[in-house]
Amino acid sequence: MNTSFNPQRQSYIKYDDSHYLLFLNEQAAEQEDEFSGKISGYTYTGTMPDGSTLIEATGVTAENMRGKFIAGLICIEYTNDDQIALLANGEDTNEHAEELAKFKEVRAAAKKAVDDLLSRAKNQQIKRAIFPQNH
């Protein structure tokens, strides 16, 4: 994982036709600048050098963005085939029950991360609408 400082708050960026960069694990931070002293900003931790996380997501719209981003994060850990197998197996054995519990934890973490990210993005859009000269 990579952690990177950014003086501007980030949320997500369309990378190409089938990928997005999600800026997750946001933490308020300060960094020393040799010219102007301390700079306030944020750190992000992810798989990419800039602290973002690259996910696969196609056909993203405002209406389906949450689901697409959650699915993209889950697919980093589990392929679609793995997910189908986990859900089909259910809890029929102790091993399957443990695997399903772990999957549910990953899914819950992905949902929380995306909800935090989309809340941040919405707040940024509101600020831009209210204070367009500052953004």
Across the structure, where does each feature detected by a protein language model lie?
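A preference for well-ordered globular domain cores
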Residues: 2-135
